């Protein structure tokens, strides 16, 4: 009888353990989700959104014809201007002037922008950009305004002035407008 009792006890133990083993074999599946965002280095100009380069307007105002100087001299009547560039994560920032010779500049004069004003344009007058406070004008076709390996917030300054076209002896009064393409590049 003892043997029967032992067998019943063993059967009861196995029967009790059977639900435990079937519960341990249950499989559940799930998903681990990973999220994030990869941002590109960016630079903005004068508060614009990244990748949008705004039109930068420089109003030179009015000047008497007799005050317009030749390119070689430091202008006495100029407009100081600055452009702020803010970069996040960018490297090797370069701001280059990209005027097209004879399209944006006077023929043979890579330092003088051509007057493209319509209506009543001034004749014999262009616009030049100078290093701030100096008589050194920028080459508008291939000049570099800024070159910085680790930029953050950078300010470019320059002086803009009306200048005489050296190929013209007589200038006339009128409107002046010029466009200067530039390029902002960074890694």
Model-derived segments and spans:
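Bacterial N-terminal signal peptides
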Residues: 10-17
């Amino acid at each position: 009888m003892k043997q029967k009792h032992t067998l019943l006890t063993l059967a009861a133990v196995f029967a009790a353990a059977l639900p435990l083993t079937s519960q341990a074999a249950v499989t559940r599946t799930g998903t681990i989700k990973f999220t994030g965002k990869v941002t590109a280095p960016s630079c903005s100009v004068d508060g614009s959104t990244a990748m949008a380069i705004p039109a930068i307007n420089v109003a030179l105002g009015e000047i008497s014809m007799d005050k317009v100087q030749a390119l070689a001299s430091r202008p006495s009547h100029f407009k100081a201007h600055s452009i702020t560039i803010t970069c996040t994560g960018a490297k090797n920032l370069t701001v280059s002037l990209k005027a097209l010779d004879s399209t944006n500049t006077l023929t043979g004069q890579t330092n003088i922008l051509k007057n493209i004003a319509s209506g009543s344009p001034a004749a014999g007058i262009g616009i030049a950009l100078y290093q701030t406070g100096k008589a050194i004008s920028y080459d508008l076709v291939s000049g570099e305004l800024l070159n910085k390996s680790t930029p953050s917030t950078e300010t470019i300054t320059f002086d803009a002035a009306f200048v005489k076209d050296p190929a013209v002896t007589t200038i006339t009064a009128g409107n002046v407008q010029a466009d200067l393409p530039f390029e902002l590049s960074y890694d």
